[in-house]
A protein has these predicted regions:
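N-terminal domain-start signal
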Residues: 1-103, 107, 111
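Mid-to-C-terminal functional-domain signal that highlights helix-capping/loop sites
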Residues: 100-134
Length: 134
């Protein structure tokens, strides 16, 4: 992702993504996070499916939180910074994005916060990485 502003500005605000086959595929991949056998999540596939949904449906919170987690897992601290920047830009348009129900938005934000904390604990952060978080 080149920059957060460019990323979000490329897309319109999206609606409910459930009518797209990629949405079902994305949810199936993300469900691995809670599967008892703990199969590996294919983060490259999560990123690919998220981008496909953004192109077809526009940006909405449910897909964006999956995308943010995927680029964090794939790109480390730089991905986390870009993803959270994109999330910040979307949240500034609170009145415009899906889902419209506040409780659904809060649930998605709580979920991504928990998953980002877990991801952050696994990152190997070096001194030279620190400018990415300031």
């Amino acid at each position: 992702m080149a920059s957060n502003a460019n990323f979000i500005s490329q897309f319109v605000m999206g609606g409910d993504p459930c009518t797209y086959k990629e949405s079902g595929e994305l949810q199936a991949e993300m469900s691995k996070l809670t599967h008892p056998a703990r199969p590996d999540v294919d983060w490259r596939q999560v990123e690919k499916l998220s981008l496909a949904l953004f192109r077809q449906n526009g940006v909405e919170l449910q897909t964006l939180v999956c995308y943010v987690l995927a680029i964090t897992r794939r790109q480390g601290l730089a991905g986390m910074a870009d993803g959270l920047g994109s999330l910040d830009i979307l949240l500034q348009r609170w009145a415009d994005f899906w889902p419209v129900q506040v409780h659904s938005r809060i649930s998605l934000l709580s979920w991504v916060t928990e998953k980002m904390q877990q991801a952050l604990r696994t990152l190997d952060i070096q001194y030279q990485d620190l400018p990415q978080i300031y």
